[in-house]
Amino acid sequence: MKTFCKAVTRGRYVIIAICLLLMIPAAIGYKNTKINYDIVSYLPSDVETMKGQDILSKEFKQGAFAVVITDNMSTKQILNLEDRIKDVKTVNKVGSVYDILGYSFPVQMLPSDIASKVQKGDKNLILVTFTNSTSDDATLKAVEKIRGLKKSIQVAGMSATTLDTAQIANSEVIMYVIIAVALCLIVLMLTLDSFFVPFLLLGNIGVAIVYNLGSNLFLGQISYITKAIAAVLQLGVTMDFSIFLYHKFEYWKTQRDNKLEAMDEAIAETMISVIGSSTTTIAGFLALCTMKLTLGVDIGVVMAKGVAFGVLTVVTLFPALVLVFDPIITKTAHKSVVPDLSFIKRFVLKHYKIVLTVFVIGLPLSYYAQSRTQSYYNLTAGLPSYLPGVKANDVLKKDFKIVSPYFILVDSKMDATDVKKMVDQIDDLKGIDMTASIAKLSSQGITEDMMPDDIKDMVDNGKYQIILLSSKYDTATDQLNSQIAHVSKIAKSYDKHAIVAGEGPLMRDMVTIADTDFTNVNSTSIGVVFVIMLFVLKSISLPVLLVLAIEFAIFINMGIPFMMGTKIPFVASIVIGTIQLGATIDYAILMSTKYLEIRQGGGDKVQAVSTAMDASLQSIFVSALCFFAATVGVGIYSSMDMISTICSMISRGALISMIDVAFIAPSLLLVFDKVITHTSLGFKKKGA
């Protein structure tokens, strides 16, 4: 370790040069990393609805679809518009009711339930399918091109809202970083003793962030959620590593003859402390990889990498920067304005039994509250209402009463009589307000011979045929999920290989998988962090007590939406607990490590807790404030509810964990001191 430390301090200029040069390939990697804006694509491939999507993509060459809404256009103008849409790159098929009826027949010739879904007043619908997937760049460019063909048209569907998501996410992501950096800078300016050090801290973390984002190229792609929150989370989580090294350097400067030797000692202490504590944080993020929804792998791996890069730059680049700019640091020194927190220590030492009583009463209550917090799964519900795709979807709902369209894939060779019977049964289900199939149209006098090949190819490829459905129920509701189950049962009674797919069924699978993921991720993160703490603290009881303390903070944070009567995005409900546990358990470890040191040295429990609080409260305060600052601004600024909620809850969680560790953790140490000393290694009998 000494050799490494000396290599860093003596080779500081080389390290700075290498780190800056590595920014070039990292920046190239960042620019070329594909971003996925379709959360549905993270569902497991073995889910039936994903198999349905796969059939659409491979067998029908329909990777995505959109609905074009025309207004006050004649039949001739609509057909001309269709021709223009067909010329757009990656568009596969285009069709409307006028391709079947032409100029001569009125829409009223169609079955009434179908007619009301394709024409309403002066508005008409055109169905467009794309060769590529919903979130593919080519599809998004095609949707954008179609929107620009005529000012009066609107484009609805998942591809349209995915484009909106991409555009708003890309327009805001730079502001997320700017806001996070600005707020962190304010906190650091106030809490550190030099006006220049904050710039070095942020510069060092900025390099680590670029490395992390650049290395995502090797993952193939990352989600827009990961892209939006990765930088601010990495900033908030790893900031205290750099602060720890800086404080150690300032201390050792008073104990050694020169600053190089002081930095050697600071790096050595930082490596021992930070590598140990960062392991719990990394483990917490990697617990997200247990999610069946592979978005968890996406976020977990990226954030675990971010922490690792943060540790690496803290023990290499940051010491080099501090040594090179030490004269400026000295010249810009000022008095820190961190408040005296000794009043917390005095309160806890005097009233720890009351604090613990609050904890014992609050733990089950907060658990109940968080278990009652509701999530929403409708991915468009969290988008701003002014977006063109959201507006178009609203037109479909309000004017055409198309709330949740989905479809059934059945054998193309199924007898037309059986298809009609099946469709009739489905029509009788509560909430179904439209079904459409070739067999149904044929029974109304519109034969296959009357249909253009493009229309027939959209719904029958010789191997599979598609039956379209429309439901009155909103996506991701219990009513729709129940309806889908009944539709599936009916369809499979006619064709055991039938598949019910589309946005509604996909969201139904999302609900089922998310509920499982929530349980798995939380239990895995707690288990992994617990095991690591067993080795770090060499104690059986302390990990239990500290995890309970942090879980209490998590329960409070997750229970607040229930108490406020609000719903949160389902992704937030899964990842918040793990992120908060992994990022803030270090607060509790920092305090308990000092407590163990004093107790194992022969000090009594009051002395140990008192010293531990003196040594850790200010560090916890600064670290939590930085974490809060890095995320709260994004939570307020973001117009995307998914990003806003995640960042708001993380920032709130940082403050709750800070208060929790400041009051609950030392109270637990005092009350369970005897248990701890008898279940931990390294204690002397005297004073135990």
Predicted ranges, named:
Residues 1-35, 41, 134-377, 492-688:
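Membrane-embedded transmembrane helical bundles of large multi-pass transporters/channels
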Residues 45-65, 70-159, 374, 380-542, ...:
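Structured non-transmembrane domains adjacent to transmembrane bundles in polytopic membrane proteins
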